[in-house]
Amino acid sequence: MLAADGGKGTPRQIGIADADPGSISAAVWSPDSRQMAVLATSNHGTPALFDVSATGANVRRVALIPGAVHGPKFSPDGSRIALLYSSPSEESNGPTQATPRDTGAMDTHIDRQHLAIVDVAHGQMKVISKPDLYVYEFDWSPSGREFVVSSANGSGNNNWWVARLEAIDASRGAVREIAKPAMQIAQPLWSPDGREIAFIGGLMSDQGSTGGDLYTVPATGGAVHDVTPNIKVSLTTFRWRNAGSVLATMLSHGASEIGTVDAHTGALQPLWSVDESILSGRTRGIPEISATTDGSAVALVRESLATAPEVWAGPPGRLTQLTHANTGARPSWGKAVNVQWHNDQFNVQGFLIYPMNFDATKHYPMIVLIHGGPSAASGSSFIAENSEQAELSRDGYFVFMPNPRGSYGQGEAFTRANVKDFGHGDLRDIMAGVDAVIARYPVDGKRLGVTGWSYGGFMTMWTVTQTNRFRAAVAGAGISNWLSYTGENGISEWMVPFFGATAYEDPAVYAKSAPINYISHAHTPTLIIVGERDAECPAPQSFEFWRGLQHEGVTTELVVYPDEGHHFANPEHQRDVLRRDLAWFDKYLK
């Protein structure tokens, strides 16, 4: 762990002798900035909470906490640390991890996450939330007597989409409802004067991938108020500056922005914008910062498709680089450009990566890489050397990463534009982008491929049933049949906000977006990849599409990776996916 003094000094290392090497997962400042709460593991894997002085001279293990712990926050007086806690018997794999095999009686295990308080002086921990309540996020009230939480009853993996705002008494655990917004909610924060709760609300497909408008609600409960109903950006994080203003990060047409928002009028004052990604540890690709209490200074990691990540700090717009850890790192892929085009009523945006060793006298094949989500966005981040984009670029491909309607970056109306319309307007946006790229860059329009994972996998399956312009496709963890998917996946609550009803209540709205219903139109050679134990996009969805393509005489191959979930964890499997991906495109596009 490194610390630096306000952007002025050389970062210094702080060691925690009792922590397992490389195990630090969180570090937060106390209100007086004299100490930090640090989460790590100790004794070969047991989660532990440490109290560390700002200089690093004094380090004390406050508590060993068997189970899982996340998100520590000091109380306003610094005497207590609240955190999210699951006991060993209540822990569960997240929705993107490999799910346990479904055998025996179903629904007997309910994953739970509690709100707990640790006394800093004595190390005693007390769980204060109700046993049947899953707490996703929380914030202390300014008095330290209450918490605001986003929470839901039942298993946490499936119920984040229907979470509500509640207040929990910090001493007795009594619960009162503040609001039940008709959208997904993230980052509830109490105002400094204690009168309001602010949060980001919007259509969100995944916890942690945050984007939407700024909302407020009285701390005593009542109607929620959309403070920023017409902004053309997606708010991703914020913090209160004072009782009437917040400092926010935003995603805007592929750029990361910092600005202030009046918490009552919604007036937005931009402070800084950069065609890069900025982050501070939550979700890569979603702009986020760490900031002083008054918002006058920030700390963040800057990176782009051209520059490796480094830590910067200072007033927004006048940042100083603190680290030079990646000075020698250079992209192992071609240059990247921000591309914009018009379709229907939207100005759409995406990124285009050139082939490595580009020769302006040649035309190159292009792969369209569709992001997951759909509530997300492809951004300008320093991708891994062994990422799909880098490998394709080095192999002589343009890589086009569109952000069609349904993505973040252009306001909530744009994000909501694919509700009840999966695969239709978003595909039109993508194909208009393909045409725009072909018109402006040396792309061979007869050598196109398409790929994606999760929502991108669904879109790949959908695309090959709607157009024959692509000569090859690779569909990762896709969805082919919404009706059967409803009975197979472990997070079905996410579907209702996007389709307006369950598949049992309105099968028609799902049927019009199901690739399997248009399988007779498919002709594109398609490689299908999925994890054996994927709970988000279960393997049977890939089997259905594979069988359908076989029935239609389409060249296809299905590869199921053992013991993998939605996000593959085994490095050998990750490398094998890339190898097969490149070989498939090379076979049909080279």
Which ranges hold each PLM region?
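N-terminal, post-signal-peptide region of Sec/Tat-exported proteins
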Residues: M1-Q13
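A flexible loop/linker signature enriched in serine peptidases of the S9 family
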Residues: M1, A17-I24, A37-F50, L64-H70, ...
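Beta-propeller fold detector
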Residues: T10-G15, R60-A63, K126-S129, R176-A179, ...
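Serine-hydrolase catalytic core recognition
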Residues: G285-K590
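Hydrophobic beta-strand positions that form the internal "hydrophobic ladder"
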Residues: S33-A37, G78-A82, F147-V148, G194-A198, ...
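Short loop/turn segments that connect beta-strands within beta-propeller blades
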Residues: A4-G7, S53-A57, D119-G123, D169-G173, ...
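Residue-level detector of Asp-centered blade-edge/turn motifs that repeat once per structural unit
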Residues: P31-D32, P76-D77, P142-S143, P192-D193, ...
